[in-house]
Amino acid sequence: MSLFPQILLRLLFLAFTLKSTSNAEKHDKVDYKDFVRRDDGDTCLRYTTIYSQGEYETTITIPPNSYSNGVSLSNGTLLSTSSPLISTSGQFTSNNVSTTSSQRHNTKTITFFSGTSDYTSVYYDTTGTDDVVYEYHPSSERHKSTNDTWSTNLPTNPTTTAIYSTSGSSNITTPYSNRITNSNTSVNDITSKYLSVGTITLTTISGSDLYTSTFPANGTTSGTVEVVIPTAGTVTETAVSGSELYTSTFPANGTTSGTVEVVIPTAGTRTVTKISGSKFFTTTTDASGTVSGTVEVVLPTAGTNTMTVVSGSRFFTSVVSASGTVSGEQVIVYPTAGMVTETIVSGSEIFNTTYPASGTRTGTVEVVIPTAGTVTETEISGSELYTSTFPANGTTSGTVEVVIPTAGTRTVTKISGSKFFTTTTDASGTVSGTVEVVLPTAGTNTMTVVSGSRFFTSVVSASGTVSGEHIIVEPTAGVVTETVVSGSVGYTTTYPAHDTVSGTVEVVEPTAGVVTETVVSGSVGYTTAYPAHDTVSGTVEVVEPTAGVVTETVVSGSVGYTTTYPAHDTVSGTVEVVEPTAGVVTETVVSGSVGYTTTYPAHDTVSGTVEVVEPTAGVVTETVVSGSVGYTTTYPAHDTVSGTVEVVEPTAGVVTETVVSGSVGYTTTYPAHDTVSGTVEVVEPTAGVVTETVVSGSVGYTTTYPAHDTVSGTVEVVEPTAGVVTETVVSGSVGYTTTYPAHDTVSGTVEVVEPTAGVVTETVVSGSVGYTTTYPVQGTVSGTVMIVEPTAGYVTVTTSLGSSSYATTVATASGTSTGTVLQVVPSLFPGCNSKCTSSNAFRILVENDSISPSYLTYRESDGFGIASSNPSPAGSEGIFYYDSTLKRVVTCCDERPYYRTMEGDLAKTYFFIEDEGDGTYKFKLTYGAFSEYLDVKILADSTFFFKAMDSSSSTILNQKVRASNVYFKAVPL
């Protein structure tokens, strides 16, 4: 059942509340009793009484070793006996017994006297049978004082207590479960189900308002769960996943095992829920001075790690020394400290706001992979063999830092009828999370390449060299990506944080040193050696595709991520190679069906230039495939300009590489140093545009919108234009289409814009009702176009009622200046109506009626108010609302509904709602002057039903009753 009908049903049933006619009156309190161990070691017998308006507890403290009958409590165990009741007649002085009573919330107070007193504990019957009063037998709950000698009789059964009914003798299960499980259970293991130590939970129902608060007691700290995995020692782990093999060895000497620390529940949280009429208010705030729970994980622990990975023809081996190294660390804060979440439901509107508390920060995740040490890597790709060794001395391990969720995000969701609106904004002054990785650091590189008959060996000295550096920001530094899925609706927003800079990729391969080359072709062998003295080493600097650009592809399971983005203030990439003499080097390698042709310029040479650069600088493209869900996002980095395409062919300063592996071919062209890229007249897509496509089952989402501060391309046709987000959702028979612009964007100046920037178009089809809404986003300006379809700033709603369709167009957007077309749908309400509106009115469906479908319907033909039948004509069902003054459901003309129960809708036999005059109502079945009350039950899902009486109750059952076990349900218009 959706939220809107539930709210209306609550209103309906508040008006139809029944007062039971049972013989016994309910009492307004419930008593509980259990044993607890106090911090000072005393064993306490605690009595807790909960009233309908609050609660309080009274504790009798029984010190250890106080019993004279030889049964001791000093070991923390309970008395052992097989009898139904423990009769502890042991004597101990009143000086050893203390009685305390504390009032919790506007309640009565129990006092245990030192004289003679009898106590009776009253319980509610929870078995669902007749309402009967139960009480303890006097001998099971009596405390007397004679000459300072106390006698205590306590029940021992862990789940039941010998209690007796006023109407007979029977054992009844008490409505609480926190009993001692057996006679040998330590009281240290007992935790009261009610009023847990250090935590106060208060629930109050006053009228239609429900208040729930949970907060820690003064000076207490929430509970913790601590796990250590694995324990200290030597651990050898081998994992095979697909073609990947992982082996890790951790020495025990001096190492520390990983820890897992959980705090549940989070300390210092207060939650208040209020229900007032149809409004629900929920607020969660942190208590003053408290800190939220933390989860800490250390994986793996410090030590020596050996990892071998086989992926296709590639082998990776890494050895990390434990000496002086620090293990990777992962720190998670869940939930985020200092966060306030507020949910308000007012009528059909839902408001959700999440924002950080004053002075708090969001949680962080930190990972160090791999840790500092020695890394040896061997890679075989086809006929190529690569081996690299990196010493640990002076190296620094990589770091990964993530902040989830992004600090300071506010999300508001509004539901109006079948329409969903979601807005997400960032809080002022917050910064999004970053991911930073450093891969293999400075060291000595040895590379041997075998391609056909050619062997290449390069040795690079580590002395004075600079390590290759790989820095990744995922998502791009300062970029916030948020995805919200509500039902079948998915919302994704990507926007950059203020003044952030994107990441870079830089690789340095074989630097200054000695190069030895041996070529064997047939019986001819060639050997060339290049001395390092006074030579300038060949450098290869690759930014793929262009300099200052980061392209990252990650495949995890069925999930693939591809990201391309530029570094701050960088120029397109360069490839520079010196081999073996200055000038131009041309190299051709044929291996099997693979042909490689490379032309390298010598030092200080300048390559040719061309007119196309592909892909363009400053663009981030991300593709994620998870199951049947595909996500594609393209957006520019901060302060970048839209794209150019540059292609380099065999002219000077150009490197062209072609690799064929199986049926897969790869071709890459790199420009040389100091070249300038060409420009073109068309940019597709235009700069600053994000396009996202998501397919999940039968649900399809398409969204296009620009990044912050970007300007759309000026093109002949833009579909859709820059700054526009288009979303299409199909779920069953429901279709949603929404078009809206990103924050502060301006639409392109084009010949046709469909739809124009700054416009949101939403179409919802539910059953026979279709809704179409078009409206602008606040602060946006529509495009300058020849055709705008539909017109900006208008809401169009189409409603089908039976065979009739109505369309309404209303200008609702603030500040819009487009033409006005106003068509008013004929009113759903009768002419006498003065109370019903589209937001508060509903129909009442009768389920389980032998006439189906059945509604409470006005029947003017027989002049008898409201009767139940198939509506004729279609759409003639009665419309109702809740009158808060009358405190009941009435028609729009203030008529009080009837419901006929007999076959054929006999005018003389009907049911109606009778006002008892004390704020309660009864369902009454009438046949002429004869009347009976129906048996009415309210169900857990907030619907209710009533059933026909048996034949002994009424003569009216001589006719066929059709109202047996029927349900009423409110249905929104």
UniProtKB/Swiss-Prot annotation:
- Where does this protein reside within or beyond the cell? Cell surface
Superkingdom, according to UniProt?
A: Eukaryota
Region spans: 18 X 35 AA approximate tandem repeats: 198-828
Give GO terms for biological process.
Answer: flocculation
Record domain DIPSY: where = 820-973
A Pfam family for this UniProt protein? DIPSY
The record ties this protein, via InterPro entries, to:
DIPSY, S_pombe_Mam3/Map4
Record keywords: Glycoprotein, Repeat, Signal
- The signal peptide here is 1-24
On whether Hydrolase is a keyword of this UniProt record, the answer is no
Can you tell me which residues are glycosylated? N75, N96, N147, N171, N184, N218, N253, N352, N393, N848
Q: What is a single cellular component term in the Gene Ontology annotation? A: external side of cell wall
Q: Where are the sequence repeats?
A: 198-232, 233-267, 268-302, 303-337, 338-372, 373-407, 408-442, 443-477, 478-512, 513-547, 548-582, 583-617, 618-652, 653-687, 688-722, 723-757, 758-792, 793-828
Q: Which cysteines are joined by disulfide bonds?
A: none
* Function of the molecule: May be involved in agglutination during conjugation or other aspects of colony formation. Induces flocculation when overexpressed.
Record-stated family = Belongs to the mam3/map4 family.
Note the PANTHER family from the entry: M CELL-TYPE AGGLUTINATION PROTEIN MAM3-RELATED
Q: What is this protein called?
A: Putative cell agglutination protein pfl3
Source organism per UniProt: Schizosaccharomyces pombe (strain 972 / ATCC 24843) (Fission yeast)
The protein's gene is named pfl3
